[in-house]
Amino acid sequence: MENFVRNTKLNIEEEIKRIEQQPIETLDKIKKIIDVIQVSLALLKTAVIGYQFQNPEEEILFFKVWKPQISGLLMFYVRLYQIEKNRADKSLSVQCRYLKMELENIQKSFLNNSFYDYYRAGQTVLDNQYFIRANYDILSDIHYHLLDRDSSFTTLHDSSVAMILANQHLIEYISGEIDSLSEKLQLKFISIVDSKLLQWTDSKVALVEFIYALYAGKCFNNGNTSLKDIAFCCDCLLYTSPSPRD
């Protein structure tokens, strides 16, 4: 079984590389990758149903390590498709805010999660209950929306491990995208400042009043920004030239 799982993973990795090189849209690539993983999981399921694990330790290893590596990859790409679809055609700043919100939600999923603590600590005392099919307890199943799942290919927490792995992939991916977008936004800001694209054509008195209005209205960081910082940002962003109205 170990060799079968290893070959399955290698095949998936090769297919992903091949698809990534195709000159097609990102969403189409992700859909193709999802199809590949779904087929691989179906073949893995068929192999497991017809296989007799040598001992409980091998079954635990399969459902705690091997299967989640593949099913977690499927969860990752399904969520990635949703994320990429939601951010498509959005401005850089909107994408950045959206991804930061998604990242925060994923990180929150790890809080107050007893199984996550168990898994991350490398504990094994409950593995027989969590990763042996015969010990599956429907009353303990936190994935209540999947109660009709196939008991021949499912344990109490193999999908929990898969979700943890998927979320770890998502955190890495989203963090990288946020860094990339932030760099682009910074370069765009510098370009605007250097090119003097935004020129303040009203009086300087009006500019001062504008800055005070932003400060009084608590328009930045819920009011946790100093007047000096707001003035500095406006001075950097807005090109002011001598005006006869001053």
Residue ranges and their predicted role:
Residues 37-56, 217-238:
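Amphipathic alpha-helical interaction modules
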Residues 189-235:
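Basic amphipathic recognition helices
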Residues 239-246:
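Conserved small/polar residues in nucleotide/adenosyl-binding loops
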Residues 1-188:
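Intrinsically disordered, low-complexity acidic/Q/S/K-rich activation/interaction tracts characteristic
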